[in-house]
Curated annotation (Swiss-Prot):
NCBIfam families: accD (TIGR00515). It catalyses: N(6)-carboxybiotinyl-L-lysyl-[protein] + acetyl-CoA = N(6)-biotinyl-L-lysyl-[protein] + malonyl-CoA. This is Acetyl-coenzyme A carboxylase carboxyl transferase subunit beta. Residues 32-299 form the CoA carboxyltransferase N-terminal domain. Residues 291-311 are annotated as: Disordered. Pathway: Lipid metabolism; malonyl-CoA biosynthesis; malonyl-CoA from acetyl-CoA: step 1/1. PANTHER family: ACETYL-COENZYME A CARBOXYLASE CARBOXYL TRANSFERASE SUBUNIT BETA, CHLOROPLASTIC. Keywords: ATP-binding, Cytoplasm, Fatty acid biosynthesis, Fatty acid metabolism, Lipid biosynthesis, Lipid metabolism, Nucleotide-binding, Transferase. InterPro entries: AcCoA_carboxyl_beta, Acetyl_CoA_COase_Trfase_b_su, ClpP/crotonase-like_dom_sf, COA_CT_N. Acetyl-CoA carboxylase is a heterohexamer composed of biotin carboxyl carrier protein (AccB), biotin carboxylase (AccC) and two subunits each of ACCase subunit alpha (AccA) and ACCase subunit beta (AccD). Pfam families: Carboxyl_trans. It is found in: Cytoplasm.
């Protein structure tokens, strides 16, 4: 019998007993190293997390709601359960059923849909924070997201607290058709409820914020903050270029360009957002607060190598 037929190889003959068993069980995470889209450097994941998911080149990575809550609130916070809605009312199917895509997104993110709500304090002042999760079907706005937005607004009204929204979305969810488009006026009315109650509504625009989200609640804030480099617009730049058949200006639809044109009030590094929000809340709520969060200074990563290298 040959070595091939009985599954043996020359390597197995020289490997010490038990060694192959040890290595076969070794599990290496897929995201141990993360590539920076700007510098193309590889950044060690733990260093990226310690640096608030901002790369050494200054690129602000997209982050999950749990991290966003952790970075934003003074300390402890309480997540609020999001409302349940009818699943797949249109029985939509393209390459696969909508229900299958929902199940995959839920498994990937551990969330029921694209929005998460939490309450806590920022600078000692009570606040309701709503975060869109781009990892859940591109953060798209559907019935569940619309209901979550309204619940966050109602929570703010009940607590007489300001509402802060971190946007990150590709637009309305096409699998829900007109039902998703209906969420645009519904969320707009929720913002108006806050305004009538005299409660601040602050929007933090993160990468990307586009489509129906931009055309509704994302641009209705009393104050608009944007993270550096965030793509903000209705249609994407490639779609616009193909439509008008012209090259767009450098940095078109990026946070800094919109700041220059007066579309956003301030571009703020992620580390400075909690302190910035605290100052704004004190002014808008006309309250002194009890504490002032310090800027979250990201440590300089030690484990950064060129693309393809190893540490």
């Amino acid at each position: 019998m040959t070595e091939k037929s009985n599954g043996m190889s020359w390597l197995s003959k020289i490997t010490p007993p038990g060694m192959s068993k040890i290595f076969s069980k070794r599990d290496t995470p897929d995201n141990l190293w993360v590539k920076c889209p700007v510098s193309e450097e590889m950044v060690f994941h733990k260093d990226l997390e310690a640096g608030l998911f901002v790369t050494p080149a200054g690129h602000h990575m997209r982050i999950a709601p749990a991290y966003r809550f952790q970075f934003t609130f003074d300390g402890d916070y309480t997540e609020i359960e999001t409302p349940e809605v009818v699943k797949d009312p249109l029985k939509f199917r393209d390459d696969k059923p909508y229900t299958a895509k929902l199940a995959a997104a839920r498994k990937k993110t551990g969330r029921d849909d694209s929005m998460a709500i939490a309450t806590g304090t920022i600078g000692g002042l009570d606040a309701v924070v709503l975060v869109q999760n781009f990892a859940f079907m591109g953060g798209s706005l559907g019935m569940a997201a619309g209901e979550s937005f309204i619940k966050a607004a109602e929570t703010a009204l009940a607590r007489k607290a300001p509402m802060i929204v971190f946007t990150a979305a590709g637009g309305a969810r096409m699998q829900e058709g007109a039902l998703s488009l209906m969420q645009m006026p519904r969320t707009t009315l929720a913002v108006e409820m806050l305004r009538e109650a005299g409660l601040p509504y602050i929007v933090v625009l993160t990468d990307p914020t586009t489509g129906g989200v931009t055309a509704s609640y994302a641009m209705l804030g009393d104050v608009h903050i944007a993270e550096p480099g965030a793509l903000i617009g209705f249609a994407g730049p490639r779609v616009i270029e193909q439509t008008i058949r012209e090259k767009l200006p450098e940095g078109f639809q990026r946070a800094e360009y919109l700041l220059e044109k007066g579309m956003v009030d301030k571009v703020v590094h992620r580390a400075d957002i909690p302190a910035t929000l605290a100052r704004m809340l004190r002014v808008l709520m006309k309250k002194p607060g009890t504490s002032m969060p310090a800027a979250l200074t990201p440590p300089a990563p030690d484990h950064v190598v060129a693309d393809g290298g190893s540490h």
